[in-house]
């Protein structure tokens, strides 16, 4: 029995002029997600996915490489303007924003959206080295 050939539709890339770059900088990793205005993800990259493993993931350079990768993928959608939202205390905060700026995006605003507890969960104990 021969199957009828199914037509393969080419995925149409939507053209988005402005987006939002969400930078989640934890102490162990940095995640950069570029979304449209509604919050639908266009591209994302992590410092672990950029080839860094272990303690090198948490460096500013790894965050810079991850932001460059996410930026290159977002430029295929026609993103020109970015609003940057930074979350977390990690070391890759500033370098990710600098990398997006150097990638040719016009950054309209930078906001810190780090969640601050109203005395919620107990924080992790201090490290003794």
From Swiss-Prot:
InterPro entries: Ribosomal_uS11, Ribosomal_uS11_bac-type, Ribosomal_uS11_CS, Ribosomal_uS11_sf
Molecular-function annotations in GO: rRNA binding; structural constituent of ribosome
Record flagged with keyword Zinc: no
Highest taxon listed in the record's lineage: Bacteria
Pfam families registered for this protein in UniProt: Ribosomal_S11
Cellular component aspect of the GO annotation: ribonucleoprotein complex; ribosome
Keywords from the named record: Ribonucleoprotein, Ribosomal protein, RNA-binding, rRNA-binding
SUPFAM superfamilies according to UniProt: Translational machinery components
Ribosomal protein in keyword set: yes
UniProt record, GO biological process: translation
Similarity remark: Belongs to the universal ribosomal protein uS11 family.
General function of this protein: Located on the platform of the 30S subunit, it bridges several disparate RNA helices of the 16S rRNA. Forms part of the Shine-Dalgarno cleft in the 70S ribosome.
Subunit structure: Part of the 30S ribosomal subunit. Interacts with proteins S7 and S18. Binds to IF-3.
Name of protein: Small ribosomal subunit protein uS11
């Amino acid at each position: 029995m021969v199957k009828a050939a199914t037509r393969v539709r080419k995925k149409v890339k939507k053209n988005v002029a402005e987006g939002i770059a969400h930078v989640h900088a934890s102490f162990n990793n940095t995640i950069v997600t570029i979304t449209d205005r509604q919050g639908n993800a266009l591209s994302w990259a992590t410092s672990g996915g950029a080839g860094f493993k272990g303690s090198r993931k948490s460096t500013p350079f790894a965050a810079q490489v991850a932001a460059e990768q996410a930026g290159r993928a977002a430029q295929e959608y026609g993103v020109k303007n970015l609003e940057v939202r930074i979350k977390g205390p990690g070391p890759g905060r500033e370098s990710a924003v600098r990398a997006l700026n150097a990638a040719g995006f016009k950054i309209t605003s930078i906001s810190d959206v780090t969640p601050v507890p109203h005395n919620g969960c107990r924080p992790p104990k201090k490290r003794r080295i």
